[in-house]
Amino acid sequence: MAEAGQPRALPTAFAPPPPLWKHFTPGNLKKLEEIKREASKGEDGKARRKDWTPAELRALDLSPELGFLVPPEIPTKGHYSVFGELQSLSTALPSLQEQGIEQLYPSPPTETDREAPSQPSRPFNHAYYLLKISKSLLLNFLEFVGVLSVAPEQFQAKVEDLRNLFINAHHLLNLYRPHQARESLIMMMEEQLKRSREEIEQMDKLHTEIKGFLDQLKAQGVDVDSAAESVSKATKKDDTSNKRAAEDSGLIWDILGEID
């Protein structure tokens, strides 16, 4: 029996943070900034703005407690640990055989099989095998219920069968993800192409309406070209007058400055 004064350990959903977080104090952060400022000074003695990399920070003369403030290098290969479990950096999906799990469906054709002209490979039908696994799950669940009603102590074998079926179904869905991503990209590009065509059609329609309106004005005796040239000349004249007014204003301010 535990002692009355001993605190009871409470289970948590997530692992506690590493103890190095205790070193992230305002004082330590200020010390690190001062060291970085001193190290970034140039020949003129002025500190220069610099983006420090973790390798450059480790090269500085830091105390052990300040060394915890330096971010680690980003792993590029191998494995990393998350809540005590090793995660691989490789994006390739490992096969069930590599994980020591029985595979209940045939392996999809590889690139080597597709390139072999003497052995043409059929496309892998994910939906067909997913349907077969789903039916097997229903059958094994009924058998599992029957085992529990007759001999409950022999449930372990059926639990393993159900577990293996679920793992195979999940792995088969993961194999289908590249195809799903490709189809989603195709749908997205088709939607963008459709919007672009609609915009082009609207622009063509507007161009036709404007051209018809101009033709109508010409038919009524309005010189559209001369009107456009006069508008352009008026705009240029306004720009010239505005520029001249700005120069005159600047000259007046210069004269006032000399008087002061």
Swiss-Prot record:
Residue numbers spanned by region Disordered: 1-21
InterPro entries: Med7/Med21-like, Mediatior_Med7, Mediatior_Med7_sf
A Pfam cross-reference name: Med7
GO biological process, one term: regulation of transcription by RNA polymerase II
Cellular localisation: Nucleus
Nucleotidyltransferase keyword on record: no
UniProt keyword list: Activator, Nucleus, Transcription, Transcription regulation
Gene Ontology molecular function, alphabetical: transcription coregulator activity
Gene Ontology cellular-component annotations: core mediator complex; mediator complex
Keyword Acetylation: no
UniProt similarity note: Belongs to the Mediator complex subunit 7 family.
Assembly description: Component of the Mediator complex.
Known function: Component of the Mediator complex, a coactivator involved in the regulated transcription of nearly all RNA polymerase II-dependent genes. Mediator functions as a bridge to convey information from gene-specific regulatory proteins to the basal RNA polymerase II transcription machinery. Mediator is recruited to promoters by direct interactions with regulatory proteins and serves as a scaffold for the assembly of a functional preinitiation complex with RNA polymerase II and the general transcription factors.
Name of protein: Mediator of RNA polymerase II transcription subunit 7
